[in-house]
Amino acid sequence: MIPAALLLAACAAPVPPLAQGLPLGITPASDQAFDERVQSRFPPGSAADVLVSELRREHFVIVGHEFTKDYELSASRSRESFPCKDTWRVYWNIKDDKISALKGTYSLVCL
């Protein structure tokens, strides 16, 4: 008989390609590693449409913000694997069709 936890883990959605190979868990290193990956793949000054296309391809949900001072746009993708939920977020600003500011965050919440 297969344990229920093993079956649930096997059903979890995959990690998005942008985060593959990075540490997961509740540590500052996990959040920092995702931010560094985002910064290296889409450095400020690069074309914003490339970032948006990649995030959409990876099934991130993109949202515009008028209420935040720091970033105009964000995208998030979550992966639920009971009892936990991983969430990756990317925040950015655009000026003249280029990324002017960028930040990636990762979080893990468990019951």
Task: Locate each region found by the language model.
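Terminal, regulation- and interaction-focused segments at domain boundaries
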Residues: 18-53, 58
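C-terminal motif of bacterial Sec signal peptides marking the signal peptidase cleavage site
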Residues: 8-10
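Sec-dependent signal peptide recognition
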Residues: 1-4
